[in-house]
A protein has these predicted regions:
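Non-catalytic nucleic-acid substrate-recognition regions in nucleic-acid-modifying enzymes
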Residues: 2-152
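Class I S-adenosyl-L-methionine-dependent methyltransferase catalytic core
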Residues: 2-47, 55-61, 66-72, 152-156, ...
Length: 363
């Protein structure tokens, strides 16, 4: 084997062949815990009769067959990533080393790579025992056949392998990055939301082109940008007290080409100065800290910010908010029972991060 990924191509830029039509292939969308129903809803709206859902035991994945434009397949905003799936009727990975199976495997990987203009610079294998002698032999065979360096740590082409019901399931990711990685993000502001989580929050509000939206504590603008890329608005405001947040939001809205649709304001989220009931949708990415003394301070902060949100939101309007400080959130809402009614509460799981996401209705 070549020196385990040390060989490098000149970096290729993704060249997604959006015009290509895929025919009756199996795909797998990776989703975060707590978002499956929202992702399914987006898939059904966008892919419609061109998709057929497939039963699968993994709850953090959605499997389906699809025939149609690649562009539509990659337009899903709420999923983390999308893979092409291929089932091999083998009892163990070693069988892939046979000339017939390896030729089949390499041709399949090549066909997936071609969907993105052969933009991979290297590849890695995601599997139990990925550094075992058998897996390394498989990686070596793929590397030689595709002339693509194997990089077990940072390969941008991803091949997942695992046992399935009828043999082994192989999943090959489309593109060099997860779907949740957005090209519009020019400044990665500290604490910025995962963009797919933000898109899930947006769909929780049932976005409508007649909405008047404010994103309180907008940070780098992720929630606000995802809202504008999903549906039109009457007007939208991003609000943050931090000058660096305002700068980040400005840069990112420019990257998303929505800068003319947003008014970015630097002011105190507890006293915004806007008129009463001017908005019908409020989105809040609440800050949180892991240090105990700082978390105690969140209680009063959350109470004041969510009270201000109630002042800004018209009766019957909606609010979504996300935080990992469950105690401070519960404290604030217990003191604002006359202002808000909880319509949806869920915990979204992203590795060790388990924030509470709430949809509220103004009463």
């Amino acid at each position: 084997m070549k020196e385990s990924g040390r060989k490098r191509r000149v970096k290729n830029k993704p060249n997604l062949n959006y015009g290509v039509i895929v025919e009756n292939r199996r795909f797998c969308y990776m989703v975060l815990g707590g978002t499956r129903d929202i992702v399914q809803g987006e898939l059904r709206r966008k892919l419609r009769h061109q998709m057929k859902e497939l039963a699968h035991p993994k709850k953090d994945e959605i499997h389906l067959t699809y025939s149609g434009p690649l562009k539509r397949l990659l337009s899903i905003r709420t999923a983390q990533s999308v893979f092409v799936r291929r089932d091999f009727k083998i009892s163990r990975p070693r069988t892939l080393l046979s000339p017939e199976n390896m030729s089949d495997l390499v041709n399949w990987i090549r066909s997936v790579s071609q969907l993105t203009g052969n933009c991979w610079n290297s590849f890695r294998i995601d599997a139990a025992g990925s550094q075992s002698p058998t897996m390394l032999r498989i990686a070596d065979a793929i590397e030689n056949a595709l002339e693509l360096p194997y990089d077990p740590d940072e390969g941008d082409g991803v091949l997942a392998m695992r046992p399935g019901e009828l043999g082994w399931e192989l999943l090959c990711r489309i593109g060099t990055r997860p779907l949740a990685t957005r090209s519009w993000r020019k400044i990665d502001y500290r604490g910025s939301l995962n963009a797919a989580i933000a898109a899930n929050l947006v769909f929780m509000t049932q976005p409508d082109p007649g909405d008047r939206v404010i994103n309180i504590m907008c940070g780098g603008g992720t929630l606000l940008i995802e809202r504008l890329l999903i549906e039109k608005v009457v007007f939208a405001v991003g609000l943050d007290v931090s000058s660096s947040a305002v700068t980040a939001t400005s840069a990112n809205t420019l990257g998303a080409s929505v800068q003319n649709l947003i008014n970015i304001v630097r002011c105190d989220a507890k006293r915004s100065g806007f008129a009463n009931s001017i908005f019908n949708v409020v989105m809040i990415d609440l800050p949180y800290n892991t240090v105990g003394s700082q978390r105690l301070g969140n209680r009063e902060l959350y109470l004041q910010v969510i009270r201000e949100a109630a002042r800004l939101c018209e009766i019957g309007g909606r609010a979504v908010m996300i935080t990992d400080d469950h105690s401070a959130l519960n404290f604030a809402l217990s003191n604002l029972k006359d202002d808000w009614k909880v319509m949806d509460e869920r915990i979204i799981t992203q590795r060790q991060y388990r924030p509470t996401c709430l949809l509220l209705r103004r009463i």
